Amino acid sequence: ISVLTLGPGHVLNDAFGHSAIRVKDPVYKFDIVFDYGRYDFESEGFYLKFVQGQLNYEVGQSEFDDFFDQYQYQNRSITEQVLNLSTVQKTAFYSLLKENIKTENKTYPYDFFYNNCATKIKEGIETTLNSPLVYDPSETFEQLSFRNLIRSDLNQNSWGSFGIDIALGSKIDQIASIEEHLFLPKYVFQLLENSRTKTTNTPLVAETKNLNPS
């Protein structure tokens, strides 16, 4: 089981990158990707709802090859972090993902900062481990406001940046806590790189691979 981190795209809803979970089983011969970033782009007022957190998102499943081809075609970086999990933990994580993708469970209330494709990664890992991850925040996070975090991926003079500023209001200048950095996939990537499991004190990531340099 591994975490896939995708680089930024060229439209607002892809500007911050993407996160997904890959499950590969050579015995049963499947290689699939679960991601929590499915939405109806054609819904009325999509971008305003996007930043205000008024959308329903879904978890979806796709073949890895199809997933890879899509993002390779968009010339977006794809980095894979293979997780250092036991067989029991891998089975538990896969079972969690299969439960989440059931029709009655797959829809969730999207929130720009607190409930998106990136935050779901840490949530799923900690649920599987039944314990919080251990990491040194000084190696991973800076003291930055939400505005600074957003503008690291958006041109501050763009309409997208302006629209997010307006939609998020005064909150945008608050300093983000460690957990509040994790709405951005790149910070989830950094968190996992520097994390250890609480019970065994071993690195969470066994191997990091650059699958598609952009």
Could you say what each language-model-derived stretch is?
Residues I1-P213:
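Soluble extramembrane regions of membrane proteins in the secretory/endomembrane system
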